[in-house]
Amino acid sequence: MSVNEELQEHAHHASDPLSKKVGATMAIIAALLAIVAVSGHIMTTEELLSQQKASDQWSYYQAKSSRRYLSDVASDLMSATAGETAAKLAEKYKKNVEKYVKEGEEIQEKAKELEAESAIAGKKAVRLHFGEVFLEIAIVVCSLAILTKRKLAWHAAIISAGVGVGLSATVFTILH
């Protein structure tokens, strides 16, 4: 094939209206893919951070439970010991036990809230990642539409992109 024939063939392909439409569609899908991918990564990060915070709260809860247990033991020991000083110490340790029980309940509640936040972020991340997959498939099918010059492939790509955007948009419906 001569250089002139090759240039004419490229010019013919460049003027193909389907290729232009598919190319524009690919650009739009790529922009949507970027938005969905970044959103998915943000949700995954949020999920992991919330889970780590919940884990920290549970560790704090265990530390408070240990202190409560030690104060309870100390109170029992002081109650068994005769004397005014021992009675005062026993009362002090009983107050500590009450304080640690109350703090433990608050910490436990906070840990459960963080676990719930993590679960919600995880659900959102999964939907965004599936949306990302459908958008990636749409780009591949757009490429096939350009190569095969078939409108059916272009329409399939648009449907795949619609599914991807739709799945991604459902993150706004996840409340718990």
Question: Where do the protein language model's features map onto the residues?
Answer:
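N-terminal positive-inside, membrane-proximal cytosolic segments immediately preceding the first
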Residues: 1-25
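Transmembrane alpha-helical segments and their cytosolic interface motifs
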Residues: 20-28, 119-152
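Hydrophobic membrane-insertion alpha-helices, especially the h-region
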Residues: 25-38
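Aromatic-enriched hydrophobic runs in primary sequence
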Residues: 23, 31, 47, 81-83, ...
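Cytosol/matrix-facing amphipathic helices and coiled-coil assembly/linker segments
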Residues: 12, 37-126
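Histidine (H) residue identity feature
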Residues: 10-13, 41, 129, 155, ...
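Juxtamembrane interface at the cytosolic side of transmembrane helices
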Residues: 7, 21, 137-176
